[in-house]
């Protein structure tokens, strides 16, 4: 038998691209699995709550400061970091999640709206309710994992004891 036959592949070894060339990484992820792919911009506002208190632009104080963090000179020299203050409550939000000032302004307003709603409504706020539900789900998952671990230990003990008998 020759060595050529051992290395014969039925299909060419080429990379198959799942999406057209011009798409960015998060767009490719969205095409592959639309429910899973989340960009950092979408993560900032977390969810869109229609029942939140509305913000009055007259009660807001907005500043643009220089950025920080990874990105080097392009990030550190431009003033695209938004500092938004709600004057009546004194809540301050700093947003520097994107390089765009407009996107940072929108994100800062969403985050401030959530924080102001929690400040005034407390435990009745939809944001606070969601946090409680998430904590409850986490606790349930932890409890199930602990029960599963105990069952596995018991099964292992039974298996080892039956092994010693034979």
UniProtKB/Swiss-Prot annotation:
Residues 122-148 are annotated as: Disordered. Residues 126-137 have a biased composition (Basic and acidic residues). Expressed in all areas of the brain tested. Residues 127-160 form a coiled coil. Residues 57-121 are annotated as: GGQ domain. It is found in: Mitochondrion. Keywords: Coiled coil, Disease variant, Hereditary spastic paraplegia, Methylation, Mitochondrion, Neurodegeneration, Primary mitochondrial disease, Protein biosynthesis, RNA-binding, Transit peptide. GO terms for molecular function: ribosomal large subunit binding; translation release factor activity, codon specific; tRNA binding. GO terms for cellular component: mitochondrial matrix; mitochondrion. The modification N5-methylglutamine is found at residue 73. Pfam families: RF-1. Methylation of glutamine in the GGQ triplet by HEMK1. Residues 1-35 form a transit peptide. A motif (GGQ) lies at residues 71-73. GO terms for biological process: rescue of stalled ribosome. It comes from the Eukaryota. Interacts (via C-terminus) with MTRES1 (via S4 domain). Associates with mitoribosomal S39 large subunit, peptidyl tRNA and nascent chain. Part of a mitoribosome-associated quality control pathway that prevents aberrant translation by responding to interruptions during elongation. As heterodimer with MTRES1, ejects the unfinished nascent chain and peptidyl transfer RNA (tRNA), respectively, from stalled ribosomes. Recruitment of mitoribosome biogenesis factors to these quality control intermediates suggests additional roles for MTRES1 and MTRF during mitoribosome rescue. It is linked to Combined oxidative phosphorylation deficiency 7: A mitochondrial disease resulting in encephalomyopathy. Clinical manifestations include psychomotor delay and regression, ataxia, optic atrophy, nystagmus and muscle atrophy and weakness. Belongs to the prokaryotic/mitochondrial release factor family. The GGQ domain interacts with the peptidyltransferase center (PTC) of the large ribosomal subunit to trigger nascent chain hydrolysis. This is Mitochondrial translation release factor in rescue. The gene is MTRFR.
